[in-house]
Amino acid sequence: MKIYFSALALVALFLSAVTALATINPALQMQTGNPSAAATDPIANRTNFLIQRAQYAFGYNDTTREPNWVAWNLTSGDVGSSGRSPDFFQDTTLPAGFYQVLPTDYSGSGYDRGHLCPSGDRTVTRADNDVVFFMSNMMPQAPDNNQGVWASFETYCRTLADTGNEVLIIAGPGGFAGSTIASGVSIPGFTWKIAVV
């Protein structure tokens, strides 16, 4: 019995030390799984192309011109003082033949460039924060949603991480009905996000 409790104490100590470490690592970004079975062959998977970055992983859809989903880990070690990038970026790392959404594609649409993996979750370095400003991490969001309940949930998840928890998050758009903004970026009928603590 004494050995059992000692082992549990060591595991608890190890886990509490690990959760404070940054989770900027491609291998850690898909602990919630690959919900659409996205794969890395760009020819066979134009609507479900898997991209794994150090900051987040996602299944990209070249038809809707946005992610099907984005997954990332969040701990207190992922939040620093680099601040928010002042710019959005065209994602030139998408496969050849995929449309690269421009920051100006959302101009005049009435929709925000809504982050899936949010800026505030990747502020240890400026480079980490810049990556979440790739347009391939955006979906059109109504300003009331993006700046309201969506932003509040992002803040809540960071609060959970700040108190020592590891938060596994996956989010995405859904309910497409054929409406688009400039350059054919699809407008989702709803947005969704799941956080596992």
Question: Which residues does each PLM region occupy?
Answer:
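Bacterial N-terminal signal peptides that target proteins for export
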Residues: 1-8
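Domain-level detector for secreted/extracellular nuclease and nuclease-toxin modules, and
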Residues: 4, 14-197
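Short N-terminal leader segment in a subset of presequences, especially plant chloroplast
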Residues: 9-13
